[in-house]
Amino acid sequence: MSNKFVITWDAMQTYCRQLAEKQMPADQWKGIWAVSRGGLVPGAILARELGIRYVDTICISSYDHDHQRDMTVLKAPEGDGEGYLIVEDLVDSGDTARKLREMYPKAKLIAVCAKPSGKELLDDYVVDIAQDTWIEQPWDMALAYAEPVNRKQK
């Protein structure tokens, strides 16, 4: 992908709070199902913001860091999803979202970020991302010392 969009921890917190505001009133939700692994951090932040104590995971494997591959459902809660928020960090091609809709037709599917190919599958999201953009999530990055410019020229 030719473009990158970097999300800092502060930005992720802000985006998740914005997403949480759209899910009010909180007492309408039985719980949160976070899609592992990308939805784990946003799911935890939403659980905190909404005061939701019941958090479970849906484990679907479709990426090896930056390469999409065949989708495998590793763990899935029972039911049709009624009363649950399914939380993702990103909807990209929409393949995972389509699978989630098939598995849980009555759940509310939300994500922090959405690309054009998948955003119509979501009930809510907060950040539009161009299709040709790779997202660097804060949990995939590390802070590092940067040499001052004047020292690089010696």
UniProtKB/Swiss-Prot annotation:
| Function of the molecule | Purine salvage pathway enzyme that catalyzes the transfer of the ribosyl-5-phosphate group from 5-phospho-alpha-D-ribose 1-diphosphate (PRPP) to the N9 position of the 6-oxopurines guanine and xanthine to form the corresponding ribonucleotides GMP (guanosine 5'-monophosphate) and XMP (xanthosine 5'-monophosphate), with the release of PPi. To a lesser extent, also acts on hypoxanthine.
* One GO-annotated biological process of the protein: purine ribonucleoside salvage
Chain positions recorded as guanine binding sites: D92, I135
Quote the protein name from its UniProt record. Xanthine-guanine phosphoribosyltransferase
Q: How does it assemble?
A: Homotetramer.
InterPro entries listed in its UniProt record: PRibTrfase_dom, PRTase-like, Xanthine_Guanine_PRibTrfase
Task: Please state what class of enzyme this protein is.
Answer: transferase
Q: What is its EC number?
A: 2.4.2.-, 2.4.2.22
Per its UniProt record, what SUPFAM superfamilies does this chain match?
PRTase-like
Q: Would you identify the family this protein belongs to, as annotated? A: Belongs to the purine/pyrimidine phosphoribosyltransferase family. XGPT subfamily.
Alphabetical list of NCBIfam families matching this protein: PRK09177.1, tet_prtrans_34
What's a Gene Ontology MF term here? hypoxanthine phosphoribosyltransferase activity
For binding GMP, which residues are annotated in this chain's numbering? R69, D92, S93, G94, D95, T96, W134, I135
Catalytic activity, per the record?
A: GMP + diphosphate = guanine + 5-phospho-alpha-D-ribose 1-diphosphate; XMP + diphosphate = xanthine + 5-phospho-alpha-D-ribose 1-diphosphate; IMP + diphosphate = hypoxanthine + 5-phospho-alpha-D-ribose 1-diphosphate
Named in its record, the pathway it takes part in is: Purine metabolism; GMP biosynthesis via salvage pathway; GMP from guanine: step 1/1; Purine metabolism; XMP biosynthesis via salvage pathway; XMP from xanthine: step 1/1
Q: What CDD domains does its record include? A: PRTases_typeI
Q: Give an example GO cellular component term for this record.
A: plasma membrane
Residues that coordinate or bind xanthine? D92, I135
A Pfam family of this chain:
Pribosyltran
Q: Which organism is it from?
A: Vibrio vulnificus (strain YJ016)
**Per the entry, which co-factors are needed?**
Mg(2+)
Q: Per the annotation, which location comes first and is thus the protein's main one?
A: membrane
Localisation: Cell inner membrane
Q: Where does 5-phospho-alpha-D-ribose 1-diphosphate bind?
A: R37, G38, R69, E88, D89, L90, V91, D92, S93, G94, D95, T96
